[in-house]
Swiss-Prot record:
Annotated [4Fe-4S] cluster 1 binding sites: C64, C67, C70, C113
SUPFAM superfamilies in the cross-refs: 4Fe-4S ferredoxins
Major localization class: membrane
Phylogenetic classification of the source organism: Bacteria, Pseudomonadati, Pseudomonadota, Betaproteobacteria, Nitrosomonadales
Protein name from the UniProt record: NADH-quinone oxidoreductase subunit I
Keyword 4Fe-4S: yes
GO biological process, one term: aerobic respiration
Cofactor: [4Fe-4S] cluster
Length: 163
């Protein structure tokens, strides 16, 4: 008799259905873990790789020495740099563009920079309404760096022992 009932349950997959419903019921009454994004924010790691920024030295001079290592190491070829020689025989960038539609946010540009000029910030909620809005130029990158310099410096200090 019991084997017939088991066979009936197995043939109609009722046992699996009951197991599935029990699992669903258990999670239905459990505590919710969903974060309602625009209203609630989760903590972001100091190592988060978000929007790029160009940094300056404390005296106001931009750090980039136009070595073009970041452009060479970028696997997506998202960085474009043009430079010129100055009178004191140092190079400075005249053009520094990052195409965020191509960028894969791998962080190679940040790792390869010898003067810590290009960094990736914690900013992840930016948008563009047109494709051209996501091409960040040198003044835009410097503005991001100037605005978030304190946070960038704190993140770099927190991560210093791992570099």
């Amino acid at each position: 008799m019991i084997s017939k009932i088991k066979e009936l349950f197995a043939s109609f997959m009722l046992l699996e259905l009951v197991k599935g419903m029990a699992l669903t019921g258990r999670y239905f009454f459990a505590r919710k873990v969903t974060v309602q994004f625009p209203e609630e924010r989760t903590p972001i790691s100091p190592r988060f790789r978000g929007l790029h920024a160009l940094r300056r030295y404390p005296n106001g001079e931009e750090r980039c020495i136009a070595c073009k290592l970041c452009e060479a190491v970028c696997p997506a070829m998202a960085i474009t740099i043009e430079s010129e020689q100055r009178e004191d025989n140092t190079r400075r960038t005249t053009r520094y563009d990052i195409d965020l539609t191509k960028c894969i946010f791998c962080g190679f540009c940040e790792e390869s920079c010898p003067v810590d000029s290009i960094v990736e910030t914690r900013i992840f909620d930016y948008h563009g309404e047109k494709r051209g809005d996501l091409i960040y130029t040198k003044p835009m990158l410097l503005a991001v760096g100037d605005k978030y310099e304190e946070q960038i410096a704190a993140d770099r200090a927190a991560d210093a022992r791992y570099r």
